[in-house]
Amino acid sequence: MKSPAPSRPQKMALIPACIFLCFAALSVQAEETPVTPQPPDILLGPLFNDVQNAKLFPDQKTFADAVPNSDPLMIRMQQNQSGFDLRHFVNVNFTLPKEGEKYVPPEGQSLREHIDGLWPVLTRSTENTEKWDSLLPLPEPYVVPGGRFREVYYWDSYFTMLGLAESGHWDKVADMVANFAHEIDTYGHIPNGNRSYYLSRSQPPFFALMVELLAQHEGDAALKQYLPQMQKEYAYWMDGVENLQAGQQEKRVVKLQDGTLLNRYWDDRDTPRPESWVEDIATAKSNPNRPATEIYRDLRSAAASGWDFSSRWMDNPQQLNTLRTTSIVPVDLNSLMFKMEKILARASKAAGDNAMANQYETLANARQKGIEKYLWNDQQGWYADYDLKSHKVRNQLTAAALFPLYVNAAAKDRANKMATATKTHLLQPGGLNTTSVKSGQQWDAPNGWAPLQWVATEGLQNYGQKEVAMDISWHFLTNVQHTYDREKKLVEKYDVSTTGTGGGGGEYPLQDGFGWTNGVTLKMLDLICPKEQPCDNVPATRPLSESTTQPVKQKEAEPTP
């Protein structure tokens, strides 16, 4: 292992030896791993561009998911022959994804019965896939979100798994953890989803939390079993840190001037996304003052954040082409990295490696100080993202600000201020607003998303802010119930300015199903109703229940220099 430069020994000491060991393990593994599947835009070359630009399908994801019927090289050689017709050519040479059968729930089902009945409907098995398929095989069955999302998605799955656990389907939780561990072992990280075109990026890192969830059922055995994969994922997120100088960024790692290590979202490619090809090209063309590759990278990195798209990443909330995701240090990502470090410490201790546990604790403590120093806006009184270009914390309040509370990284006095800010600026009749900005993007007002409702609810409860937490749950559940009563389905996102309406905006129509909404709804139903009187629907009047969640003892914020 290369020795650190003499000017950096103290800072490098904060990085556990396991990171370097994991890098070595990954490099050895890379020699044994099959060639990484190529995404369709590379496999098909100019043909892919021609088909997407011709807009043969209403959704660009359709052709990205189409399976070539023979070697793509042979298919490409047949293009533009005499009498060539592009639509006919595609129909002959590709198998298009099948539209999912519309699920019609039995009459008279309660909300809980509907969700429990959906788990098998949303379950898929793909142990084997066609040779040229963009779908990546997984060894165990998994639950998909629903609608156009025919594959498993990384961060969606954690909130889906909360619901599976609530329904008693611990076998499915275990299967999905095993699948994600398989992806880490196979590709070195968990991709955005199990598609070849998602391999160049990940998503909010919830794998360690998934293992922690499974450990609620299986005990420390789960932590010990998946410790190697958690370490490998940590190595992926910290890749490049060993050579990073102060003030530099490398892939997903940021080193600030004082040596603080934080993370950002990143995609290894800088081309249009195959699943949104035409849209990305149009976005890049609309801003000739920026290199197209830079815009493509920032679009892809926003997809890696899960928030695609939001004013959070933009200089001008009304212009998507001003997004610059890679120059923003997100508060939610770094909260999740803190949690990953804490769980790695716990798992290392369970495995009997106290020295390694102490190293991860040291890393977590250093990151917590970084969050308090760089991701807190003292003037506004809330957590926010850090801007690498202006070298300042940003002013915008978003629902991501509640992640430090969710992972118990916030100081008590700051959590109290967050509760006030949440109630004043984000709480709406139908739940928690994603932001207070109306940009037309789906991760902005007036949309509310199930995972953010749960993060806020749990986070506020961790700090004894039960009233605001229960307000969020009650408002969101009412929204879900009213929509279900009218449409007999749960949807991907909701308009929280009212109740009973699905959300809008973004690149595609509103999707139903819907994995993470199902999971969060079950958790919230069991939160608001007393255990001795569980509810199958949201009650007409708010129950006077007491949560079993106890606030975690917190310390006051340390003054930042």
Swiss-Prot record:
InterPro entries xref list: 6-hairpin_glycosidase_sf, 6hp_glycosidase-like_sf, Glyco_hydro_37, Glyco_hydro_37_CS, Trehalase_periplasmic
First-tier enzyme category under EC: hydrolase
Reaction it catalyzes: alpha,alpha-trehalose + H2O = alpha-D-glucose + beta-D-glucose
GO BP annotations, alphabetical order: cellular hyperosmotic response; trehalose catabolic process
Main location: periplasm
GO MF, one annotated term: alpha,alpha-trehalase activity
Source superkingdom: Bacteria
Catalytic residues of the enzyme: D308 (proton donor/acceptor), E492 (proton donor/acceptor)
Keywords: Glycosidase, Hydrolase, Periplasm, Signal
Residues that, per the record, bind substrate: R148, W155, D156, N192, R201, S202, Q203, R273, P274, E275, G306, E507
SUPFAM superfamilies xref list: Six-hairpin glycosidases (SSF48208)
Name of a matching Pfam family: Trehalase
Transmembrane segments: none
Compartment(s) where it occurs, according to its Swiss-Prot or TrEMBL record: Periplasm
Stretch list, region Disordered: 535-561
EC number: 3.2.1.28
Position of the signal peptide: 1-30
CC terms in the record's Gene Ontology section: periplasmic space
PANTHER family found in the cross-reference section: TREHALASE
NCBIfam families xref list: PRK13270.1 (NF009773), PRK13271.1 (NF009774)
HAMAP family tied to this protein: Peripl_trehalase
Subunit structure: Monomer.
Family (UniProt): Belongs to the glycosyl hydrolase 37 family.
Function: Provides the cells with the ability to utilize trehalose at high osmolarity by splitting it into glucose molecules that can subsequently be taken up by the phosphotransferase-mediated uptake system.
Entry protein name: Putative periplasmic trehalase
Source organism: Escherichia coli O157:H7
Gene: treA
